[in-house]
Amino acid sequence: MALFARDRERLARRWLLLASAALAASGLLAFGVVAARVPPFARYLTATELARRVLVVHVDLGVIVWFSALPVALFHLAAAGPRPAGRFAAFAPWLAAAGALALVTGLLPGWGAPA
């Protein structure tokens, strides 16, 4: 029973790490958007297309990744019982992190356009 609890705690830590990293990245991107509007920097940061991309990725990381990863982490912390997590449960946080990284690649020049 303790082995299953450790597995669930490890999975919860991974999901919480993903959620926290997404929220931190979202905050940094928000800071970048705000800094681009400050008058001393505004004359140098005039790329409105980049600002739109940063805003889209900021919202995606903050809403999609954060609000998806946090409930999964809480579920793993609250789960109880003799059954272990599924065979592929350890792979899921890595797959979600790859998806979050794919969201961030939208910031690269020539890689997509905001809708």
Task: Explain the meaning of each model-derived region.
Residues 1-69:
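N-terminal signal-anchor module of multipass membrane proteins
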